[in-house]
Amino acid sequence: MHFFQSSLVAATMGAALVAAAPAADLETRGSCTFTSTSALKSGKASCSTITLQNIAVPAGETLDLTGLKTGTTVVFDGTTTFGYKEWEGPLISASGTSITIKQNPGAKIDCDGARWWDGKGGNGGKKKPKFFSAHKLNKSNITGLKVYNTPVHGFSIQSDHLTIKDVLLDNSAGTKLGHNTDAFDVGSSTYITIDGATVYNQDDCLAVNSGEHITFTNGYCNGGHGLSIGSVGGRSNNVVNDVTISNSQVINSQNGARIKTVYGATGSVTGVKFQDISLKGITKYGIVVQQDYENGKPTGKPTNGVKVSDITFEKVTGTVTSSATDIYILCGSGSCTNWTWSGNSVTGGKKSSSCKNVPAGASC
């Protein structure tokens, strides 16, 4: 028998009658509590509020929050865990319109990624499940989730008008063997806001590969690869427009503020603003724009098929390690134009002698 509770029915008829409720009553049912994925799958469509209570997701299964009724609220309660299997995931998938996803005080989502970590991430070794697919989660909110130790990528975002606020993604236990644990990957999306994220990971804190009207603000990023646009190029959608990344800290990471585009590809990066970004302990580049990525690696030879225009770097300040490079700009011929460069100060590392085609006003 599927287990779920309805506050509208159980309050007067008792839990024993819930499973036997006629179909007509299912449409009016309000608050439902689920303790298993099977009960969630069969009962979610009838609920306006869903509480997920200490769910242990079986190995190789997705916690399926897709196709929810418009206006549904989902509440994580207790500890959510996942069985072990080598597969691509996702561990959680959500879709719908005007959905709210949040958690009760003290709740957490524990992926126990150490079971998969082998230092190779998505590049070999064990096949690792991605964490959260937020595809077609439109006009919705994800608030206050506490997420620990994703096996590989965190939130995959492909939605419109989605706000993610005050989310913790803590992969600090993966410092040695965690890899490709990107926190927020954004693609083919519009009007995305990520506000107040706290991230400890081993890859990009934010990566915007395509999309428009995207805001990342009040973030704290520790241990990963920094705040990134790209890599842009070579995908079905190669347009990034109107992205603001502001009031954020990047600590003990490879890069601070980064734009990277693919060698030989076409596309555009326009209207991107990095504003009030604080850097500390950066180990590779404080500010970096590279147009030379091929097969995921830099070639040192930039191309100009992806236009990088109307870019603002304003008050990106802080320190890099002595072996790092303060600023590195490697643009294709004529492809980096109309930049605003103001109040930036990155110190502690080396000055690059390999910058090319630096746009007017910027310094390298």
From Swiss-Prot:
The keyword tRNA-binding does not apply. This is Probable endopolygalacturonase B. Belongs to the glycosyl hydrolase 28 family. The active site is at residues 203, 225. It catalyses: (1,4-alpha-D-galacturonosyl)n+m + H2O = (1,4-alpha-D-galacturonosyl)n + (1,4-alpha-D-galacturonosyl)m. Transmembrane segments: none annotated. It is found in: Secreted. PbH1 repeats lie at residues 159-188, 189-210, 211-231, 240-261, 269-291, 303-324. Disulfide bonds join 32-47, 205-221, 331-336, 355-364. It comes from the Eukaryota. Keywords: Cell wall biogenesis/degradation, Disulfide bond, Glycoprotein, Glycosidase, Hydrolase, Repeat, Secreted, Signal, Zymogen.
